[in-house]
């Protein structure tokens, strides 16, 4: 079986109006992919930017996959949350990006968005917090369902990813 090693980090985020940010992340693959080592999902620590608007997380990602086919290439899905002084968490944005398919190091910028909801939900978000959230996480990367949503742009999550490919030549795939 061909193997893919994804090694890197979620560096941080910029462009969010909220402070005290953290990121929940996960990786989604097709049925032909098997996770050999690493964890499929995780969460960063909370960071409050002191200078500028960059929240730094430097959260490690280390995944090792085996695959029988290229369908369902791995993609990272991200949820950025903010935490207020009372410890309440509110969604700041959803985003996703495909893991690059070429070996080497890659700097990825993942734009985020959040659902707007009705004007009442927007007003409640401004004064009380909270706001609408997706019921199913796969809507983040499923374009068919996403087009019906009214959304607002969030910030950008920055990732540094290193990719190693092994035994792809045995299966006729040139990298």
UniProtKB/Swiss-Prot annotation:
<comment type="function">
    <text>Component of the tectonic-like complex, a complex localized at the transition zone of primary cilia and acting as a barrier that prevents diffusion of transmembrane proteins between the cilia and plasma membranes.</text>
</comment>
<dbReference type="GO" id="GO:0036064">
    <property type="term" value="C:ciliary basal body"/>
</dbReference>
<dbReference type="InterPro" id="IPR010796">
    <property type="entry name" value="C2_B9-type_dom"/>
</dbReference>
<dbReference type="GO" id="GO:0016020">
    <property type="term" value="C:membrane"/>
</dbReference>
<keyword id="KW-0969">Cilium</keyword>
<dbReference type="GO" id="GO:0060271">
    <property type="term" value="P:cilium assembly"/>
</dbReference>
<keyword id="KW-0206">Cytoskeleton</keyword>
<keyword id="KW-0966">Cell projection</keyword>
<keyword id="KW-0970">Cilium biogenesis/degradation</keyword>
<protein>
    <recommendedName>
        <fullName>B9 domain-containing protein 2</fullName>
    </recommendedName>
</protein>
<keyword id="KW-0963">Cytoplasm</keyword>
<dbReference type="GO" id="GO:0043015">
    <property type="term" value="F:gamma-tubulin binding"/>
</dbReference>
<comment type="similarity">
    <text>Belongs to the B9D family.</text>
</comment>
<keyword id="KW-0539">Nucleus</keyword>
<dbReference type="GO" id="GO:0005634">
    <property type="term" value="C:nucleus"/>
</dbReference>
<comment type="subunit">
    <text>Part of the tectonic-like complex (also named B9 complex). Interacts with TUBG1.</text>
</comment>
<dbReference type="GO" id="GO:0005737">
    <property type="term" value="C:cytoplasm"/>
</dbReference>
<dbReference type="GO" id="GO:0036038">
    <property type="term" value="C:MKS complex"/>
</dbReference>
<feature type="domain" description="C2 B9-type">
    <location>
        <begin position="2"/>
        <end position="118"/>
    </location>
</feature>
<dbReference type="Pfam" id="PF07162">
    <property type="entry name" value="B9-C2"/>
</dbReference>
<dbReference type="GO" id="GO:0005813">
    <property type="term" value="C:centrosome"/>
</dbReference>
């Amino acid at each position: 079986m061909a193997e893919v090693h994804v090694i890197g980090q979620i560096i941080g985020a910029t462009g969010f109006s909220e402070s005290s940010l953290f990121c929940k992340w996960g990786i989604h693959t097709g049925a032909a992919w098997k996770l050999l080592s690493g964890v499929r999902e995780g969460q960063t620590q909370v960071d409050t930017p002191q200078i500028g608007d960059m929240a730094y997380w430097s959260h490690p990602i280390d995944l090792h996959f085996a695959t029988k086919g290229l369908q369902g290439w791995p993609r990272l899905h991200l949820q950025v949350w903010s935490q207020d002084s009372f410890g309440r968490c509110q969604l700041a944005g959803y985003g996703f990006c495909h893991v690059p398919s070429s070996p080497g190091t890659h700097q990825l910028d993942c734009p985020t968005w959040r659902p707007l909801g009705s004007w009442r939900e927007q007003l409640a978000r401004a004064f009380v917090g909270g706001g609408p959230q997706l019921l199913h996480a796969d809507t983040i990367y499923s374009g068919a369902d996403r087009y019906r949503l009214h959304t607002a742009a969030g910030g950008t999550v920055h990732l540094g990813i290193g990719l190693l490919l092994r035994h792809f030549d045995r299966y006729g795939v040139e990298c």
